[in-house]
UniProtKB/Swiss-Prot annotation:
The modification Phosphoserine is found at residues 500-501. High affinity cysteine-specific transporter. Major contributor to cysteine transport when cysteine, at low concentrations, is provided as the sole sulfur source. The lineage of its organism: Eukaryota, Fungi, Dikarya, Ascomycota, Saccharomycotina. This is High affinity cysteine transporter. The keyword Endoplasmic reticulum applies. Disulfide bonds: none annotated.
């Protein structure tokens, strides 16, 4: 059999026909699996069904609840704006936009250092620390009385929240196989799209308080902060670092989880060493930058949900109480659409790009109608604003999951996520500024930017990514068996603290499991890209 050249990053060692990978560069679950794997039998279909049910009831519920609170916190400023916040702090439409911009300045700045810390530190403990800081900042928001104070708090809130979603997505990747994760992503993000439902009802209740001793927006913020505090305690006590140490699964179940994930993805579960070679590869891989460009363009529309309550009131005939109920109805519609998207992805394979394009269409149509309808058609404009402002979150969800799952190698995954979310942060720095007070009440320039860039050009980029990855898959599938055997023949793990020394290491063979070596998708030509 002719050998295919196996290219591995600089952290590995090539000796004649062998590639030796130091054990410190292997999957962090390796030691756990070496101790327990042999004693655990293969999972039966009935056991796998029970395991999947338990995973969704525990891990999935856990990360979805955190995600819900994250977006409830993000929405506080939007609801505070109709609860007397502007009057107490002296904000105007333009300074409100600046506050939103500064939140995403912090969000963008936090991406690369935050993702680096997420790799180096225990994931669960790091998340607990972020949530504790986030809770403190939410409560401190009640002390803000001017523009400077609001800006400072929102900047640090953006900095703190910047890597929470990547941590949640990484956690999903550790516990669910590739098909489950792809199908569950819209359902997972239904939590964020549905956040206006509980938030809107809380605001609706607060608006009914008569003769309050403190401002209504402060009462609202304290309630949201209290919920976040409870979640912080739960995360610190029970959120897992990885499948090897999750407290509410048996050792046998942990082994099954690791086997399933590694078998379906062909990549490692977690890696605590930051690999410069994988970082460089991620930055050179043009797929990384295509995803970054998608998020830069698509997220120019992301200020629309935060503008909704102000748009509703600016139309006239919709008061503060009415705008909260309209937001709740719009969020309910978005959640239903997210469930439908989940069913689509579960039923049909390799349709990520097409599904994202399909769910961009309501936002495109809604934006065109909101900009074009006569101003006296209040009901029509209101309905189309709701349609435009809620549904475009689904393509974002699909793309964020796809950006991660289409990369292999732990450092490369984190680097690509950082680039994607940094681009999202830049877009959200720009986004509030397209809603200029002088363009009110119709804001036609903002609608045009969203129609052309966010809802037309951005989905076309996902289609381009689909065709590029499909071409790579076709090339790999031609020689799949030969490539797989070649890798298994040549790559071995060496137990050594000194990665530059072969002699002092002990070679350990891991047959038929390339996942433990933490190879990237370009290093491992048996990696098949999800589409």
């Amino acid at each position: 059999m002719s050998k295919v050249d196996v290219k591995i990053g600089a952290d590995s060692i090539s000796s004649s026909d062998e590639i030796l990978v130091p054990s410190r560069l292997a999957d962090v679950t390796l030691a756990f699996m070496e101790e327990n794997d042999a004693a655990v039998p293969e999972i039966t279909p009935e056991q796998e069904k029970k395991l999947k049910r338990k995973l969704f009831l525990t891990i999935f519920t856990f990360v979805s609840a955190i995600n819900l609170l994250l977006y409830m916190d993000k929405a506080t400023l939007s609801y505070d704006s109709i609860l007397g916040f502007f009057e107490d702090t002296g904000l105007t439409q333009n300074t409100y936009n600046t506050v939103n911009t500064l939140f995403y300045v912090g969000f963008a700045i936090g991406q690369f250092p935050g993702q680096y810390l997420a790799q180096k530190l225990p994931l669960g403990k790091f998340l607990g620390g972020l949530l504790a800081t986030w809770t403190i900042l939410i409560f401190l928001s009640c002390t803000a009385y001017n523009f400077s104070g609001v800006v400072a708090l929102r900047f640090f809130l953006g900095l703190t929240e910047s890597v929470v979603i990547p941590i949640l997505i990484t956690t999903m990747g550790m516990f669910f196989d590739a098909s489950e994760r792809a199908a569950a992503q819209p359902f997972f993000f239904a939590a964020c799209m549905g956040s206006p439902i509980p938030t809107g009802f809380i605001a609706y209740g607060v608006l009914h308080i008569t003769n309050p001793s403190i401002s209504l927006w402060k009462i609202f913020t304290i309630i949201i902060g209290g919920l976040t505090f409870i979640m912080t305690v739960v995360v610190i006590l029970w959120f897992p670092n990885n499948p090897a140490d999750v407290k509410f699964f048996s050792i046998q179940e942990r082994v099954w989880i690791i086997r399933r994930v590694q078998a379906s993805t062909g990549s490692s579960i977690e890696q605590k060493v930051f690999k410069k070679s994988q970082f460089r590869e991620a930055m050179k891989d043009y797929i990384t930058w295509l995803f970054g460009l998608f998020f830069l363009l698509q997220q120019l529309a992301n200020n629309l949900p935060y503008q909704q309550n102000l748009l509703f009131e600016g139309m006239g005939g919709v008061d503060a109480l009415g705008s909260t109920l309209v937001s709740v109805a719009g969020a309910g519609f978005a959640v239903v659409c997210a469930f439908i998207a989940t069913l689509m992805l579960a039923k049909w394979k390799n349709i990520s790009a097409l599904t994202a394009i399909f769910w961009t269409l309501p936002a495109l149509v809604g934006s065109i109608a909101a900009a074009a309808l006569p101003w006296d058609n209040k009901i029509g404009i209101l309905a189309n604003i709701c349609m435009a402002g809620q549904i475009f979150g689904i393509p974002f969800i699909i793309a964020l999951s796809w950006a991660s799952s289409s990369a292999s190698g732990y450092t490369k995954k984190l680097t690509r996520s950082s680039v994607s979310l940094f681009a999202m942060g830049i877009a959200n720095i720009i986004s509030p500024q397209i809603w200029r007070e002088k363009d009110s009440p119709r804001f036609l320039p903002a609608w045009i930017v969203q129609i052309v860039l966010s809802f037309s050009l951005a989905p076309a980029i996902l289609l381009l990514i689909h065709f590029i990855l499909k071409r790579r898959n076709n090339q790999r599938l031609k020689n799949y068996d030969e490539n797989l055997q070649n890798y298994l023949d040549r790559i071995q793990l060496i137990e050594s603290e000194n990665p530059s020394s072969i002699e002092e290491g002990k070679v350990v063979t891991h047959e038929n499991n390339l996942a433990v070596f933490d190879l990237t998708d370009l290093e491992n030509e048996t990696f098949i890209y999800p589409l």
